[in-house]
Amino acid sequence: MKYTLGKQERLKRRKLIEKLYTEGKSVKNFPLRMMYLQTQHTSDFPCQVGVSVPKRNFKLAVSRNRIKRLLRESYRLQKEIVYNNLEEPYVFMISYIGKEEPVYEEVFLKMQKLLNLFVEKTKEIKNE
């Protein structure tokens, strides 16, 4: 598996993002929240991901961009957790909901836990 986060793996389509926020479900592991939705997207990858940091909590764009870089990097290195356990295509948005700027180690560990929670939820849904 390549540990890259290419253009086709990124969630960019406005309609998909709107549908994700209106119909999607969420999983939380503070300070991260993941909104996810099973869908039929046109990408060759099993999931598309987007990251967001609210302007309300971080006024400076420099801070928001740094946190988004941390989120993308920690997802990129751990995406095999999701790829090895999914059968249907998903789109999801990972949001940082904390109030202070995180350090990378914290984000990495929280992302790992969040991805495992997501996999458990999808397996529960599949078993029902």
Q: How should each PLM-predicted stretch be described?
A:
Residues M1-E128:
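Positively charged, solvent-exposed patches that mediate nucleic-acid binding
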